[in-house]
Structure formats: C-alpha cells, structure tokens
Amino acid sequence: MPEFLEDPSVLTKDKLKSELVANNVTLPAGEQRKDVYVQLYLQHLTARNRPPLPAGTNSKGPPDFSSDEEREPTPVLGSGAAAAGRSRAAVGRKATKKTDKPRQEDKDDLDVTELTNEDLLDQLVKYGVNPGPIVGTTRKLYEKKLLKLREQGTESRSSTPLPTISSSAENTRQNGSNDSDRYSDNEEGKKKEHKKVKSTRDIVPFSELGTTPSGGGFFQGISFPEISTRPPLGSTELQAAKKVHTSKGDLPREPLVATNLPGRGQLQKLASERNLFISCKSSHDRCLEKSSSSSSQPEHSAMLVSTAASPSLIKETTTGYYKDIVENICGREKSGIQPLCPERSHISDQSPLSSKRKALEESESSQLISPPLAQAIRDYVNSLLVQGGVGSLPGTSNSMPPLDVENIQKRIDQSKFQETEFLSPPRKVPRLSEKSVEERDSGSFVAFQNIPGSELMSSFAKTVVSHSLTTLGLEVAKQSQHDKIDASELSFPFHESILKVIEEEWQQVDRQLPSLACKYPVSSREATQILSVPKVDDEILGFISEATPLGGIQAASTESCNQQLDLALCRAYEAAASALQIATHTAFVAKAMQADISQAAQILSSDPSRTHQALGILSKTYDAASYICEAAFDEVKMAAHTMGNATVGRRYLWLKDCKINLASKNKLASTPFKGGTLFGGEVCKVIKKRGNKH
C-alpha cells in the first residue's frame, strides 16, 4: 500500500493534479487554486494512510509524540478569523446540505477524519474552542484537538461569546508548534469576513455578566507581611483582624456604627482611638497640591465631571462589584461632588448595629490601636486640616512640621489643572545614558551609568515615595551627610507576591492571555481601533503570495520561525493593550479619589459636625483604593506576560538561522524564562544531544 504525504502542500500544483488522477480521483471542472487540490489530496489519498478505526474507539485521541525528530506541519498564512477560514474551506468543495449532517445521537461515533471542514469547525466551537481557519495544513492539528476534547468530555454548551478584546492563540501546541496562523491574514474571504464574524469585542450586556463580586480572587494566596488589611471606618485593628480573610473572598465591609458625632475638641481623641481614615498618608501631598487653594475646588470638580466616564455605560459593561465602585465615583461627580452614601452616612440605629456599637465601646479601653498607626492617622488628619485652612489638629500643633505650601506651588505647573490635564499624556522621562560598547558584558545587555544630577528623582516624587515607604514601615538607607535619603536607595522593593506573579507568567511564556473585559471594559470602537492586533495589509499579502517559495528543510524551518516570531509579537501587543486598559481605569479612579479626599478635608476644617459626611467619603475612597490595588497586580501580570512573549520573539529571531531541527527550536523557544540569559540551561542539553548524534 503506497504511503501518501501528510502535508501535500509541499507538492506543486501540477504534481498534485497528476497524483490525484493517478489514484482515480475526479478533479473539479476548470482550473482551481492549489488549496482545492491539497484538500482533495488530504480527503482521498492521505486518508488511506490511516486504517479505519473500529467501532467504539473514536473517542480516543492519537498518541502524543515528543520526539525531537518528528517533522511538524508548517503553518501557512491565513486569516485570523474563524469565519474567514470557514469561507475559504468552502472554496471548491461541494456544499454540504443540512440533511447530510449526522444525527445528534450518532455524533459521538463519528470519525473526525470524515468530517467536513465546516463540521469540524462546528464541533470545535461546541467544545468552547475558537479555532482559526481549517485548511489542509491545519486540519490534522484540529482533528487531534477535537479527539482530545471528546475524550475529556468537556463539551461546553454555552452560547455566550467571551468578551475578549482580541483573539489569543489556543493551547494546541505540539512539540512547540501551535496555531500561529490565527494572527496571519490571507487575501481570500476578506469581503465576507465582516459579514459572517460577530465581533467578540462588542460590549456585553450587563445582564449577561456575572454579578458575583470577585472577592479579591487575584489576591488568593498572596499576602504582604506586616501590612494588614485596614479595618472598616470606626473599628479598631483587633476587631478588624477577626474579620479579614475568613473565606476565599474578601468579606464585604460593614456600614459605619452609629455613634455620637464629635465636635472639634473631640477630634483628637477620635483620631487616636479609632481608625477613622483608612487610606495611607502617601497621597496627602498629591492631594494638597491638587487643592492648593480652597477657591479652586469648584474648578477641579467641574473638570472631573467633564472627564469622568458616564455611569450608564458602566452599568452595561461592568460586573456588580466594580460597577458599584465606579458608579459611586461617577455619581458623586454628577451631583456636584456630594458623595453621601445613604447606607453609610445616614446610619440607622438597628439592633444588630447597636449590639456591635456596644461591643465596640466596651473594647475601646483594651483594644486601642498601636501608637505608630495612631501617629500616622494623626499626621494624616493634620495634613487634611492644613489643606483646608486650619493650622493643625487641636492639641497636636507639634505633631508634624508645617507644610511649605509655597514650595509645593512652585513645583506645580498650573496648566496641569486645566480641563485637558487628565486626558493629556504624561511627561516623558529622560532616557538613561548607556555605557560605551567596551563596557558591555555580552550580547544586547545594556548597563547604565549613574544618573546625572539633572535626571535625579524630582523632589515631588521623592516626597511621595519616601512618605509611602514610611507609612508601610519599610526602612530606607540614609546618607550620613545632611540626613537626606539616598536617591539610589529610594525605591519600592519587589515584594515576594509580585515576584510570584512574574514567575508564574514566565513559567509558560506562550500561555493564553486571560480576558479582562469584565473588570476593565472599553467600548467596541476603542477596542477595535486601539486594542486589537493590527492586521497585515492586503497589498503586502499579495506580494507574499506572488513570491516563489524556497525549497528545502532549512527554508521551511526559517519560515516556521518567522511565523512564530509574528505570533509572539502579536501576543505581546495584546498584553500591552490589556495593561493600557488597566491604566486607563486606574487613572479615572485615582482622579476621583483626589477630589474625594480634598472634599473630606474641607468638611473637617469648615464644619466638624458634618464628620459623618467625611466618613462616608473616605469609606468610598477605601473601596476605590482596593480597586486600584487589585488593578496594580493585574497590571504586573500583563507586564510579565508582555516580557515573556517579547522573549519568545527574540528566541525565534536568534534560532531561525541555527542549524538544528525545527522540533529542537520549538522546544528551546518554549522553555520557561528565568531572566538573565535568553535560553537558560536548556541550550546545553540540546547541544549535547546534537553532538552525540554526530
């Protein structure tokens, strides 16, 4: 029995026609494209290589091979959309009637090799897979994928599309090869693609999204030492310690306990015995600069109203937990920044709350907050009062030095507070000077000289970082002269939880990007224009299709490396786009927090009897700070994902001209990244194996 090629695309068009005629295969009328003859070859000749499977064994997938010498199919350029692939697969093929499809009860007994391309695509979609185009060079890969899914029995009946910003490659890699053609484009099916494909980047109605809060799911298994979760407003640290992390998710914060509101004379005692203000005091300098004069507050409020997102859009695109946070912020801006929360600021004296208040009052004498935290709260209150025009907290005039408002105002560019401030790009940071070529160690490693004086950390940034480190209890090395903090040591450390996130992303550098559309939604227009991976122009694809392909194994290996390089760059673009989503949402929330803290300071300084309003504002600011904290970890994850895919791209760039087989190249490219060197210790193993063969 003759052996037919598994990948007939390597044959010329005339050779394909002669092989089909020699084996009694009827050719279609007229001159057809090469893909049509490749498809006929696969259906009628390649299928003869495999003996028919006995009944009852269709659900078992083929054995997985891990040999380095196994020749892998070379992906071809194709459209990244599933519908475009569906239209191409139908070219030159007899249309399949609906009545020809197998019955529901017979689908489990079908041989995947007998399915048409369209039926195979439908089966993969039913199992929750979003495949690329199915052509001759990719069909075998998808057949194996379908067999594995049927064996696992994980068919997904869901018809709701995932709200992803762009397509990500499926984890169908074998010996390092995957469906890289999802990011490629072809000249076929361009006109039909937009009609057939329903964009997965459209805004998903809020009713179709889950309303269960995330509960800080990203923080499961991640904890900061010596930095405990701040308690709800009006509670002590010991009481809050009993409530944190008693389940997998974070418990919802309780409303404020009804108490007699203190006057100005009682404010010191209130600040020293209860944790009224949860936010770290690292933001008070920025808040002071934002509100250098109380008369400018209405202008800032109006600017914030004009730039904040509309709550109606957020209602349709955000899950319950994040919708509440962002809606509360936007609601305060729409009402002229009067952030009163009925369930928190207007407190009822119900029996459960009364019992908690009684327990709180009984424990005040023995469960006082620690002196460092009390001092931090006191300093923070002082900063708010100074900002509002009051000298300091009564009885604590010496607790902190007076703030130099003039110097702060000199550092502020007044043009930054115009209506275009929030949407304007940030100032560019000067590039660090590079060492000379002689001082570089090896490769593309770049070392940096000491930062010149003009590029040192600004006094404003130095103040914020130093203040944050002090609040978090992190020590910083100091110079002996002038008692100033050394700029080279003034930095935040890489905490073990952040390093853990980076390590997880680098362990599998080609993993699929998680969807962030529910937590950080954007409109479909912005997602298509900014966040989607750019498609290759049709003119460029036309030039590529006209080029004569070079023969030989080395040429095929180089072409595969080029496609994998393009795939890695597309993934890096997706990760960077996701980080952009997160940064955009974080900027809006942080801007609203500035206005909230500024208004709370004005309330405390002008009318202490309205302290409950300030507490309501700070309570919502706490929620916004939690949102920003979790968003920061998501942004770390996206940054690590971008670094991993950039590393994969560089690996294929260096490997494409190496004289090793394609399987070894793919294995080296997918090796877990550890930093330092591009490939790590895996290179020695491959070189030894290759040396033994020779």
Curated annotation (Swiss-Prot):
Modified residues (N6-acetyllysine): K656
Comp. bias (Basic and acidic residues): 97-106, 179-191
Signal peptide: none
Protein task: May be involved in the structural organization of the nucleus and in the post-mitotic nuclear assembly. Plays an important role, together with LMNA, in the nuclear anchorage of RB1. TP and TP5 may play a role in T-cell development and function. TP5 is an immunomodulating pentapeptide.
Subunit field text: Interacts with LMNA, BANF1 and RB1 and with chromosomes. Associates directly or indirectly with lamins at specific cell-cycle stages. Interacts with CMTM6.
PANTHER family: LAMINA-ASSOCIATED POLYPEPTIDE 2, ISOFORM ALPHA, LAMINA-ASSOCIATED POLYPEPTIDE THYMOPOIETIN
Name of the protein described by the UniProt record: Lamina-associated polypeptide 2, isoform alpha
Organism encoding this protein: Homo sapiens
